Regions:
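Active-site acidic/histidine proton-transfer and metal-coordination neighborhood
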Residues: 1-57, 66, 166
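A general structural detector for well-ordered alpha-helical segments in enzyme core domains, enriched
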Residues: 12-16, 42-46, 73-74, 119-123, ...
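Gly/Pro-rich active-site loop or hairpin
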Residues: 40, 65-130, 142-150
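Catalytic metal-binding/acid-base residues of hydrolase active sites
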Residues: 32-33, 62-63, 91, 138
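Hydrophobic faces of well-ordered beta-strands that scaffold small-molecule active sites
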Residues: 1-2, 27-29, 55-59, 82-87, ...
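C-terminal helical cap(s) of enzyme catalytic domains, especially alpha/beta-barrels
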Residues: 145-168
């Protein structure tokens, strides 16, 4: 949710939920530190406010790390509230929200799963049975070095290796 007008944003999101519901579809609400829904707590509160059965929370591992979501917080969320997990790793360092790296890393400098400083295992093991995982790993430098196809292959390879090593 990017608009500063929360009422407008809520009404528009509710309209999308209602339209999607007509077709049996669900929507995912992603929290992003530099948006108007910056964290898990805010996303869940927004979902409660909208009271739509077809909206779920999307957990992006980079964003969750940056807003210091704990494994305990994830474990406390009912399984049916999770819709999607965006997988990537990233630097352990958490920049201030107005620092260029806050947006820069998110949009073009994410790291391969298991190759950064995020406690991915702690996070992923505490999200009860998410229906979907998706690798979201924009990294301009890796694409320039490896090419798009090899970058995509490496994204999948590192995720599979990480999941096997951590029994996820």
């Amino acid at each position: 949710v990017w608009s500063a007008d929360r009422d407008f944003s809520r009404v528009q999101f509710e309209k999308m939920c209602d339209l999607a519901d007509k077709y049996g579809m669900k929507l995912n609400l992603e929290f992003v530190p530099f948006s108007n829904i910056p964290g898990l707590t805010e996303a869940l509160a927004w979902m409660d406010l909208m009271d739509r059965p077809n909206v779920q929370v999307l957990v992006d591992t980079l964003h969750a790390h940056r807003v210091k979501v704990t494994p305990e917080q994830l474990r406390e969320v009912a399984a049916e509230r999770f819709g999607f997990v965006h997988l990537c790793d990233g630097p352990a360092f958490i920049p201030p929200v107005d620092h260029p790296d806050m947006v820069g890393v998110a949009r073009g400098g994410r790291l391969y799963v298991g190759e950064g400083g995020i406690d991915l295992a702690g996070m992923l093991k505490n999200i009860p049975d998410p229906p979907y995982y998706s690798i979201e790993l924009p990294n301009a430098a890796e694409v320039a070095i490896r090419g798009k196809l090899e970058h995509a292959r490496r994204c999948l390879e590192t995720a599979k290796t990480f999941f096997a090593a951590h029994q996820i």
